[in-house]
Amino acid sequence: MIGIKSIASYVPVAGVDNYAQGAKFEKNEEFILGKIGSAFLPRKDADQETSDLCVEAVNALFANNPQLKRESIDVLIVVTQNGDEEGLPHTAAIVQDKLGLPTTVAAFDISLGCSGYVYGIYAIKGFMEATGLKNGLLVTADPYSKIVDPEDRNTTMLFGDAATATWMGENPAWELGKAKFGTDGSGAPHLKVTDGVFFMNGRQVFNFALLKVPAHLHELLEDSDLQTSDIDAFCIHQGSAAIVDAVARRFEGEPEKFIKDMVETGNTISSSVPLLLEKHMLNSSWKRVAISGFGVGLSWGSAILQRP
């Protein structure tokens, strides 16, 4: 059975002081921490491309797992909507070359935003099991610094750059359980890029998260024959502190189980869930975790991860 064996990440050291940004827009520390949730927003270097972030994360994964060899990688999937240059060729091909992976590797991108990790782990699991592959890499990297207007108070205080790499293979540390997905393209205008600049209708996105995610998680638990008490933690997309707090309250069941950890990262799009899993789940005593990603599309996905 294919599942999650290990997760590693790359978070740029350089970045933006969000308190300073907030002061520019007359927002105080209480607002920055309480509503936004991030005091610091990592930023890639100007000469770093999306593929470079991917390479850093994968190299960290190799360093943490010396038994995993480059020549053993069968498939590489990159989840991004802000790939290298103008998006052609696909970023996964560039990452394959920069990493020196074998040319026998299957490599492709998945164009999804904040729901991308949940979709991605099931997509790569299905691809690997259908084709009999042994070792896969699911990489997330969506540097919004490429598209966010630093003068837009609705977006510039939210997003951080980061990348993650997940080793998918047999004899996993975490198995993939039930999952549920959804899409509502009528909400596409609420999160979009026009002429290279990102736009977000924050109120609509907040309402979407509040209405959709708690109910979706309850449906997932019901489909899995699980109770809230069976879940050790809920690792949901870190859209903002306000969103995580509101979803936890609306869920109405052990809100303290909802992990909120974005003070030093910001909203890292498809990397936010795996960053939580790497930091809080991998070396924990947890037995079962619920994850959920939601955003651009509008798109959402929720799933159960469990120890074998």
Please give the residue ranges for each predicted region.
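Glycine/charged-rich beta-loop-alpha catalytic/anionic-binding loops adjacent to active sites
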Residues: S38, V75-V78, D97-S111, I147-D149, ...
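Flexible, glycine-rich active-site loops centered on histidine and acidic residues
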Residues: E129-G160
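Buried hydrophobic positions in well-ordered alpha/beta secondary-structure cores of metabolic enzymes
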Residues: I4-S6, I32, L61, L76, ...
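Condensing-enzyme catalytic core mediating Claisen C-C bond formation in acyl metabolism
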Residues: M1-A46, P150-L211, A215, E219, ...
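Short, well-ordered amphipathic alpha-helical segments that serve as non-catalytic structural scaffolds
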Residues: N28, T50-N65, A209-S224, L276-L277
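Conserved beta-ketoacyl condensing-enzyme motif
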Residues: I4, T50-F108, L226-V244
